Each structure stands twice: as C-alpha cells, then as structure tokens.
A protein has these predicted regions:
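N-terminal binding-site loop/beta-alpha segment at the start of enzyme catalytic domains
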Residues: 1-70, 120, 124
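Active-site mouth loops of central-metabolism enzymes
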Residues: 14-28, 74-84, 112-116
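Conserved, mostly hydrophobic/aromatic
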Residues: 19, 36, 44, 56, ...
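Short, acidic/polar
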Residues: 24-37, 82-98, 118-120, 145-149, ...
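A structural motif
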Residues: 41, 99-102, 134, 158
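A short, structured active-site edge motif that brings together acidic residues
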Residues: 67-80, 101-110, 162-165
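CE4/NodB-like, metal-dependent polysaccharide N-deacetylase domain
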Residues: 86-107, 127-131, 153
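Beta/alpha (TIM)-barrel catalytic core signal, keyed to glycine-rich beta->alpha loops juxtaposed to Asp/Glu
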Residues: 110-171
Length: 171
C-alpha cells in the first residue's frame, strides 16, 4: 500500500492515509500500529489524551519499519495549553513515543474563552518547530476567525487545520 503524499506549506510530505488510534486499548493499539506499518501504512495519528502514546511507540518498534519512514503525529491536550505546559507535554510525549522528533504536532482544539493560553501553546509549538524538534505544526477544528486571531500573535502559519468530517458530522 502506498498512500498519496500531501505537501505541507513547509515542504514536509504527509501521507494522505493514516491510522488513528483514538479510543484504542493499549494492547489493541500496539498490535494495530505494528500491523498497519507492516502492510504499508506510514502515517500514525495519536494524542496524549488517547492514553496510548507509549503503545504507539511499541508498535512502531515492533514493526521493524525505520522511524524515519513513519510519519508520526500527536496532539497536545487543551489541559496542557500555555507555553511551559505545552513544552512539558511535548517532552512527555516524545518520552512515551520513544522518539526524538515528531513529524506533526497539533493543538486539537481552540479555547476561545481562554485564547491567550491557546496562543501561548501555539507559540511553544513554533519554538519546537524552529528548534527542529518537530517537522510541522498545526491546529485542529479552528474556524477562519480563530485562525485570523492566531495569525495576529505569530508569524508561523499552521501547516494544517485538521477538522472532523464524516457522514455523521458535516461542517
């Protein structure tokens, strides 16, 4: 299986098809990641809030696929928004995933009522990007208005705005 690649605004290539592990149990996650990589998947999507980052790392290692061939995406949960909190959450994520870098790091939701925390979290992502610790950064479920508000506070344009879209939830 070879998924088409999408080129992000910074030139990083993102496999268009990936495995998401939301609500997967620990053992199921490790097995699913290993199997997905063995059959050709190269994009794994997880998040701290899913509670299975450690098992994603295990599945990657067990697959035998070199880490540099896997596009690894994770998300900082809203409870970890804020500059220092986000940097700490990133350190926890890479320890659990057993990797030095993340390919795509996302803020999974805006917090309009506490937007200064969202901005501080995004600024921390931008620092991680500039330091080469993540290859691309982005947001999720931001409206056009919230993207404009974010742009007022940063020069780093999100590489993605991941939105939920399926037959039961259209936007």
């Amino acid at each position: 299986m070879s998924a088409p690649l999408l080129t992000l605004n910074n030139g990083v290539e993102l496999p268009a098809v990936g495995l998401g592990v939301f609500q997967s149990s620990a053992q199921e996650t490790a097995d699913a990641v290993e199997t997905a990589l063995c059959i050709g998947y190269r994009h794994i999507d997880t998040a701290a809030a899913y509670g299975n980052e450690r098992e994603v790392g295990q599945g990657i290692r067990r697959s035998g696929v070199p880490r540099e061939d896997v596009f690894l995406e994770t998300k900082i949960w809203a409870s970890d928004y804020g500059h220092d909190e986000t940097l700490h959450a990133f350190d926890k994520a890479i320890a659990k995933l057993d990797t030095d870098t993340i390919d795509l790091l996302i803020l999974p939701q805006p917090m309009p009522a506490y937007f200064s925390r969202t901005v501080a979290a995004y600024q921390a992502l931008a620092e991680l990007y500039e330091a080469g610790r993540v290859r691309a950064i982005g947001v999720s479920n931001f409206t056009e208005e919230l993207l404009d508000r974010l742009a007022e506070w940063t020069d780093t344009v999100p590489a993605v705005n991941q939105v939920e879209l399926h037959p039961y939830f259209s936007q």
